[in-house]
């Protein structure tokens, strides 16, 4: 398994198709998220925040199939927290060049979750981020606690599509988080995919 960083402009058409299909498989087919269908690519999942401002972390297996992904966007550009989930923040959603949003985080293999998470933080920090924001459900919040991720809640727990969610903010620097207190591999496939 290896990971790569991409932007949409850098991706080949084949890789874009692979990523769109992987996200559709994970979020629409397996999790049942009610997301708008892509107008021209059936079976692919993209939204209005997939722009030239986004960076993507992709994890590949030995057969060059995508097994994990994450999307990173500076909050100075349109993002999911501001555009869709602004109500989850007690105040205005963060908007600063050093604060990035992480969304569409998912893995097919449980053991990839934390390696992909830490690599996503590193990618953002090297690009100038000091903090990461995003939406998690209560299960993912517990998983972050178990794996030593320090975060703060940006607002109260709310309900979206019959699921409890909340907005959080955390440091983009791994050294600000403690070591995991339990192996991350215990995590079920379902739990891994339950993030925005």
From Swiss-Prot:
Disulfide bonds: none
Key words, A-Z: Antibiotic biosynthesis, Autoinducer synthesis, Quorum sensing, S-adenosyl-L-methionine, Transferase
PROSITE patterns tied to this protein: AUTOINDUCER_SYNTH_1, AUTOINDUCER_SYNTH_2
Stated role: Required for the synthesis of a yet unknown N-aceyl-homoserine lactone (N-aceyl-HSL), an autoinducer molecule which binds to PhzR and thus regulates phenazine production.
Main EC class the enzyme belongs to: transferase
One Pfam family here: Autoind_synth
Protein name (Swiss-Prot/TrEMBL): Acyl-homoserine-lactone synthase
InterPro entries according to UniProt: Acyl_CoA_acyltransferase, Autoind_synth_CS, Autoind_synthase
Gene3D superfamilies: 3.40.630.30
EC number: 2.3.1.184
Family: Belongs to the autoinducer synthase family.
GO biological process: antibiotic biosynthetic process; quorum sensing; signal transduction
């Amino acid at each position: 398994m290896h990971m790569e960083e991409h932007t949409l402009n850098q991706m080949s058409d084949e890789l874009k198709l692979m990523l769109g299909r992987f996200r559709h498989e994970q979020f629409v087919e397996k999790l049942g998220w009610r997301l708008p269908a892509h107008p021209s690519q059936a079976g692919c999942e993209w939204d209005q925040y997939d722009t030239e401002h986004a960076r993507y972390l992709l994890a590949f297996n030995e057969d060059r199939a995508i097994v994990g992904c994450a999307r990173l966007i500076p909050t100075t550009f349109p993002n999911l927290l501001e555009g869709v989930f602004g109500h989850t923040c007690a105040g205005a959603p963060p908007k600063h060049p050093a604060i990035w949003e992480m969304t569409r985080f998912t893995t097919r293999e449980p053991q990839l979750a934390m390696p992909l998470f830490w690599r996503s933080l590193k990618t953002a920090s090297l690009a100038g981020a000091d903090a990461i924001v995003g939406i998690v459900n209560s299960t993912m919040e517990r998983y972050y606690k178990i794996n030593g991720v320090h975060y703060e809640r940006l607002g109260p727990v709310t309900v979206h599509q019959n699921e409890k969610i909340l907005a959080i903010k955390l440091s983009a620097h791994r050294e600000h988080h403690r070591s995991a207190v339990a192996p991350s591999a215990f995590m079920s496939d379902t739990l891994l995919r339950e993030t925005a």
